[in-house]
């Protein structure tokens, strides 16, 4: 292997991949060079290449242990690397905060798990058994003879946090679309509280949310929760004014609530959220809350706020705000209300409660990127390889993290990100979970768009998910739609991470829907989500009409897709008829078909089954059309009915699904 090829391998630059057609595609050396250049490597500098190869391949064998050393709690083995001539020396591994030291007189009679020759000297890796260690990150001092090194010892459980292995039902929704009881034009945490009550009454165990990440207050129309300003901070627009302690006895706030601007918003009843108006009004109300806090807050509340700022200083300071205390206050209020909703779920008997959603990346001009720029690649974005729906591939416009820089940072950024998204909830869905293993990088190469897979330190990123899930008592769902490498699928299953399936895509080779008994068990299954049309729209082919209306497809494509949809509907009817005595046809009412489909899927052994609020509301307009930006008003469509009305209208279906899932029928 030549020096450049070695560096490709050590830096995680992919060599080949399997295309959606089944064809094996080998990346050109030119493409791989460009990817390496995006990592800050001068591919024409032989000295730099040799130096990097030494740092990544040889140097680790000259250290007693990696800076971040994983200890799997199934065997409690700690791996030490030594010159084989040092096996007679005593070894000590000290964990100061646990007040524990593990000592051995020598390193003989231990399993050798690897070796490497440097200048003719054999270095070996030996497995040192330790005692029981609590899950978490521990500072450790490793000593062999006179040589010593401080490392982070990550005590990693075999699986992520688990709940009892039983069939559960839940609700999925985009919180901003919920009909706001306060009339302020966007769903908020009080609306979420109401949904907690409604779900608990139907014996549901969880509510799957959209990403609640911070967006752009100064550019309020940038509405995509999947292209956020920061994934570690919350969107203040979800704060319910009335839930804040600072709303009580607040004359300034009361006057604003009776203003013409608020009344206009209250009476607007628009189909699509006007983020500019909503944001302008809510931020005026936020200022009134903050003014009241500054003037009247008790000493205990001030201490609570100060403690929040201290505990979250690293994340809060990324805001780089002109009025930091105000922005920190909003983050505090949002965190309090989210945690209150989660506790309310648990108090009502829900086994999991809220499930948060973590976007795969952040915007290139956001505070997350700007504050951590050294961790990101140069001029490479995250995307997807060519597929039948995007022959040229997809560029999602999200900066790609540099895997080597993540490692050099001791993964502090990723640990902090996962922790922030697991706090105050009972579960976390990881969007595009394959990113733990590899991501498709998009970059310009000789004035044309190019791309390849780049691999990430999978074992460490997976360890963080396992550790944080236990520390936060949080289940993990990995969104694995699309091409999933076999090693990722296996590792996620072994780690107890739920997969995520869309029923629309669960097909056999002949195009028929998978039989119930073949649906994955340790999985979250949904009929639809934010990337596909709501069921009524799909059944009535409204989504195709909308695409034609917005000139996303021409008449010929419309007719072709209409024909394909008719075939799909026939396949769906055949699936339902295997599990239902109801006589249905293509002309059947969409909600009748939906109800029978929901009841059929309720019989599956799949552990998590989510009903989408959009579907229960009989929505025909999608909340998002993938591949569009300004062509369609994505991330804005509001639900037609109140949450209470939606549950009332679907009472019989919800009761039947619950009865089937609980085994009463």
What are these regions (language model features)?
Residues 85, 218-339, 361-610, 614-616, ...:
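Alpha-amylase-like alpha-glycosidases and glucanotransferases acting on alpha-linked glucans and related
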Residues 14, 205-206, 351-353, 427, ...:
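Residue-level detector of anion-binding/catalytic polar loops
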Residues 1-59:
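Long, contiguous interaction/targeting segments characteristic
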Residues 37-74, 81-104, 113-137, 142, ...:
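Acidic/aromatic-lined carbohydrate-recognition and catalytic surfaces
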Residues 618-665:
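Structured C-terminal cap/extension of enzyme domains
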Residues 18, 163, 181, 363-364, ...:
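Short helix/loop capping segments that flank catalytic or ligand/cofactor-binding pockets
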